Amino acid sequence: MAIPKIVLFYQFTPLADPEAIKLWQHSLAESNNLTGRIIVSPHGINATVGGDIEDVKRYVRGTRGYEPFRTADIKWSDGLGNDFPRLSVKARSEIVTFGAPDELKVDENGVVGGGVHLAPKELHELVDSRGDDVVFFDGRNAFEAEIGRFRDAVVPDVATTRDFVDELDSGKYDHLKGKAVVTYCTGGVRCEVLSSLMRSRGFDEVYQLDGGIVRYGETFGDRGLWDGSLYVFDKRMNIEFSSEAKTLGVCVDCGTPTPRYRNRIDGDGRTLELLCESCSPDLEQD
């Protein structure tokens, strides 16, 4: 019986030949019948792939067999079996598109000059000891935070990751430079870059949630500082860490609380919107 699983991971490490790594990763994933997205750059790898559990395990073993990726933190979750339409493996200038490839420096230990990594329990210790001096800073697109976020988090008004550089350079967050700023994102990769960009712009005390929201949810579920659902970039669209998850999103049509993002198809194409089951019962999620 097939057991669908999804793995999410990244590794910041210098790669001399991203094109060669791309070809190898495509062959490895394809030979194991996986679908999903893999991005390779001179800075490392960022991947989310899914398939049957045994196929995924073989892919993970093969990937970790390459020394620079040996310590990759693999995050597992349950899949649906058709979570991605195809396999996409690309070589780019960045594994997360902030539009600032020349600002990021990496070595064999990861990002140079990034924020201090905090495990979920260490995050709670920081909040307990520093109180209101700690500020959560969302490293995702603003729409993701509409269905879930850390309590009282700062949510930058960004539509894409590329918007963060201008957002930081605008000066609107300069009042946080004397605070303990904790960046967070889905699995951690965006905050690796964001925290380094913030530090280079004068934010002295910057942290990043190690393993991202995914690892935090695995540790504390809905009994901690996280409220709501987690947006994910596959056909699931959102996941919850327990049956006790709060519903923060609101249907744009009727105002019913909902965590469901769906593609509304109209004359202008597709628009991702919060739509409850009553208002979008039969929308196809391609």
From Swiss-Prot:
Assigned protein family: Belongs to the TrhO family.
Q: Name one Pfam family in it.
A: Rhodanese_C
What protein name applies here? tRNA uridine(34) hydroxylase
Tell me what organism the protein belongs to.
Answer: Rhodococcus erythropolis (strain PR4 / NBRC 100887)
Give the Rhodanese domain ranges: 130-225
The EC number(s) given in the record are 1.14.-.-
For the keyword Oxidoreductase, the answer is: yes
Q: Which residues form the active site?
A: C185 (cysteine persulfide intermediate)
User: What is one Gene Ontology biological process annotated in the Swiss-Prot or TrEMBL record?
Assistant: tRNA modification
What role does this protein play? Catalyzes oxygen-dependent 5-hydroxyuridine (ho5U) modification at position 34 in tRNAs.
Alphabetically list the UniProt keywords.
Oxidoreductase, tRNA processing
Catalytic activity, per the record? uridine(34) in tRNA + AH2 + O2 = 5-hydroxyuridine(34) in tRNA + A + H2O
GO MF annotation: an example:
oxidoreductase activity, acting on paired donors, with incorporation or reduction of molecular oxygen
| Keyword tRNA processing tagged | yes
**Superkingdom, natural source:** Bacteria
